[in-house]
Amino acid sequence: MKIMFVAAEGAPFAKTGGLGDVIGALPKSLVKNGHEVSVILPYYDVVDQAFGQQVEDVLYFYTQVGWRRQYVGIKKLVKDKVTFYFIDNQGYFFRGRIYGDWDDGERFAYFQLAAIEAMEKIGVIPDILHVHDYHTAMIPFLLKEKYHWIQAYQAIRTVFTIHNIAFQGQFDPGMLGDLFDVGIERYEDGTLRWHDCLNWMKAAVLYADRVTTVSPSYAHEIQTPAFGQGLDQVMRMEAGKLSGIVNGIDTDLFNPARDPHLPASFSAEDLSGKAATKQALQERLGLPVRADVPLIGMVSRLTDQKGFQLVLEELPHILQQDVQLVLLGTGDPDYEAAFSWFAKAYPEKLSANITFDLPLAQQIYGACDLFLMPSAFEPCGLSQMMAMRYGAIPIVHEIGGLKDTVASYNAYEKTGTGFGFDQFSGFWLTQTLLFALDIYHNHKEDWQTIQQHAMTKDFSWDTASLAYLDLYKSLL
């Protein structure tokens, strides 16, 4: 099977979040199953700086972005048996950042047109074309409405994955003619219209052969007004082709037995190194070195989506307990200031690290006994899976991917991989934390059982990719 991915970012070339992780890992896993996999990405300046000496120039051509005749350079790099093609246009992609420019609509309109036309130029016509988030969401529409006359493209089946429905790509409808060079009919008949805007994501949901989200629970949630961001009715209408597949994590990279960032290695069979890692982190951050105190970690963007309003609301109560908290992340300036204030007020209980530091993040996963992740909504989430791999037991709001990946502890059946609360409130966050602390202090055998279950749960991409393969095969 020939599978092609088109996305705005992908590790290790350019990455800002979970989308980049998926594009870095899923193709690599599919290749292991004997499939021919390629990826099309923009050739950003950050890619040029890090990989410019490794890529090869394949060809170039020109495409029409409305009335604009734009250069399209194709560069190529084979990595882990996956063929990466890069769309090169310095005017659009050498901006010092991936997103956030005033002309993002034009930039990604160009990228989608160039990617579609590049398939024929480089001679790679996939069986499955898998596009991701709004930046590539017009591709299924364009294949059926603009490029349908190209015979080689007529057998291509498209899959669209929603990583976060909040970012839909809403633009002025004049873009259809001005950039995509197609008629306005599909806007005027309501197909592409949403609140008097052209909505790229709506186009993908209606035109793609299959639509996926990054967890089964999120696939259900986006069909409701509470989580659908205005597209819930469209999601319900297209529910027959909507499904959720949980992201995996790179289990080679996130492995406490071989993590170079940890001062001591450990595994589910031998946890002695975890105690040494905990002591090293306490020393590094200036917390009292105590093996008996529960160490609670938080590694996250400091935003409302991640539930930090609940954490701040309950922090005075939580800090009355005999616990230590370690925070790592940046985000909303109000949250940054609040956690910094609490860290100064409680220097022996809270270490607030307002930065992004990958080695420190790995040490927090490795050192902590508990991991706090009370997100208001979470399409999938990766941190909770990483924490479990390192024996840090997650406390989560049971929503989206958190609900699908963390099984709440059952005291009677002795099952579960963490602790969860259903109601998004500070009260239930604190009650769940107190319950977890009781198990930690007073039921050591149960705690060790939870830790074993968490550390041995299979979150590998090899498992997740099989679900995608089943989906692809159903289309052929």
From Swiss-Prot:
Keywords linked to the UniProt accession: Glycogen biosynthesis, Glycosyltransferase, Transferase
EC number(s) on file: 2.4.1.21
Pathway: Glycan biosynthesis; glycogen biosynthesis
Position of the signal peptide: none
Enzyme class: transferase
Any one GO BP annotation for this protein: glycogen biosynthetic process
Top-rank taxon: Bacteria
Catalytic activity: [(1->4)-alpha-D-glucosyl](n) + ADP-alpha-D-glucose = [(1->4)-alpha-D-glucosyl](n+1) + ADP + H(+)
Binding positions (ADP-alpha-D-glucose): 15
Pfam family, one: Glycos_transf_1
Keyword Glycosyltransferase: yes
Any one GO molecular function term: alpha-1,4-glucan glucosyltransferase (UDP-glucose donor) activity
HAMAP family named among the record's database cross-references: Glycogen_synth
Protein task: Synthesizes alpha-1,4-glucan chains using ADP-glucose.
Family: Belongs to the glycosyltransferase 1 family. Bacterial/plant glycogen synthase subfamily.
Protein name: Glycogen synthase
Gene designation per UniProt: glgA
